Amino acid sequence: LENAWLETENGRVVDFGPMDTLPSGHADLVVDGSGRVLMPAFADSHTHIVFARWRESEFVDRIGGLSYEEIAQKGGGILNSALALADADPIRLLDDAYARVEAMMAQGTAALEIKSGYGLSEASELKMLRVIRQIKERAPIPVKASFLGAHAVPLAYKNDRVGYINLLIDRILPQIAAEGLADYMDVFCDRGFFTVPETDRLLEAGWKYGLRPKIHANELDFSGGVQIGVQHNALSVDHLECMGEAEIQALLGTETMPTLLPGTAFFLGLHPPPARTLIDSGLGVALASDYNPGSSPSGSMPFVLSLGCVLLKMKPIETFAAATMNAAYALELQSELGTLSPGKRAALVLSRPVSSPDFLCYAYTEPWIERVELGRSLPSS
């Protein structure tokens, strides 16, 4: 809609329309949008932003030729983050993670999901989820928590996978439910991590406590993660670098949102997920940052838009929908966010003057955000 107005009141969208229908009357604040793009703020439905330290040494290892899996096999990767988190002070974890949330909000993110998964022990997983609960209480935006104890098998259980899965199901899940610490259940269902039968057992256990699945699937191989996710009515299946006709057919007609994480493919040099094939097959897709210290150290949703175009061959308008409306669905927030609709939250991003909406994806390092509204205004620096 070109040459338009939008009215908000008390943090909600009231109405919008062409300028020749602008209602007369007093407004407390008028913002000039001439030559600018106004769009819904982003929802980031897949992040790992509670962590104890960055992993730039692994970045150098990968430049030297090691793969993500090889780094993990020598004790790096997720296990590296788990060792650091075990000794981390919860207050420091909270302060560092909340600083990341503030930076993400300044770049237009108005809702996000945060996963555990760098704990890999009862004490550390619960510590992470309690930190996420504190972020929920502090943040002026909706935050959802996912329990990802099945992110990797910790070294202490290297020769006892069943024992670790039993720990997750019999000890940690009941405590999570007792404290109300999670909204979703996640499993890394992929080669070298958790198998389909293991994922099946874990997701079934999560459902017993009301935790709907949102799972990692098909990042490294045709793992069967998509199919088992759909079988358990997962809210989303995420990554999806390895997708074929069987996976597409499994998703069509379901309530499961395929969620693509182009930042990970970019940073790890992976073959990107086949977004064009998914979209042309009739599937909607969501885009998310996968913000984490090992494989996607960025929470910039504007950059994700650009990667959606450059890596995934999505059209700019498709990336806008994927990062707003579809991503809100992947957080069960579609009634509150994702579109500029009367009654919804007035979570908005206003660009600087630009030549067209396509510019927002094209100029991939340009600081194009002029104003963010999340119930309050934040600087975009």
Model-identified regions with their sequence ranges:
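Metal-coordinating catalytic core of metallo-dependent amide/deamination hydrolases
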Residues: L79-D96, E102, A110-S223
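Divalent metal-coordination and catalytic microenvironments
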Residues: L6, G11, G35, H46, ...
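Structural motif
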Residues: Q107, E179-G180, Y209, H232, ...
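Metal-associated gating/positioning segment near the N- to mid-region
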Residues: L29, G33-D96
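C-terminal cap of metal-dependent C-N hydrolases
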Residues: M325, R345-S381
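Active-site-adjacent C-terminal substructures of enzyme catalytic domains
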Residues: R212-P213, F222-T339, S351-P353, L378-P379
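Histidine-rich, glycine-flanked metal-binding segment
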Residues: L1-M39, E137
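Conserved beta-strand scaffold positions in the cores of enzyme catalytic domains, especially
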Residues: D28-D32, A145, R371
